[in-house]
Amino acid sequence: APSMMVFGASWLTIFVGSLMATDRNSSFLMRLLSTPLRSVDYILGYSIPVLPLALLQGIASFATAMIFGLSLNLGTFYALLVLIPVALLFISLGLLLGSAFSSSNAVSGFGTILVNATVFLSGAVLPIEMIGGGFEAFCNALPFAHAAKAVQLALAQDLNSLLLHLFWVLLYAFLFFIPSVWIFKKRMKG
């Protein structure tokens, strides 16, 4: 279930990025720019409404996993809470793509590569510990393995080990969010 949740959340990147790129090329965003909102307000307006969608995806993933034997317990609730920072990671990536690329086709192309990279670099297909070495170090330098591990640890109710992985996920979300605001602001002025 943790890998399914991270895989599902990775699709939020394409959704948010495509929505942003489409809005930027339409008159909808031009009308919004006449309001006294700041760039960060627009970015938050794309981010916050997607969080309930991420939670619904998580609930659907757990419902499917329960069909295959996952038991409902407090860890399930913790994992849904951990899904919020994981979703913020992928939402911030979508914001970055939507701000950087001018068409939804470009966002979709790059986003599809990102979804596939997430699957392989998070250990969803094959545990990265089995491969080890440089590949494991590379995966651990990226947020995807930490996202899957955070959900896995939350599900196991190992909250002490969870914090380091959540730190990595939130750090990357922040690192993707800041340039999104800057690029969006620059593109809207130009």
In which residue ranges do the predicted regions lie?
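Hydrophobic/aromatic residues in alpha-helical transmembrane segments
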Residues: T13-V16, N25, A60, S92-L93, ...
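Residue-level recognition of specific faces of alpha-helices
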Residues: V16-L19, R31, D41, S103-G109, ...
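Transmembrane helix-loop junction
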Residues: T22, R31, T35, A65-M66, ...
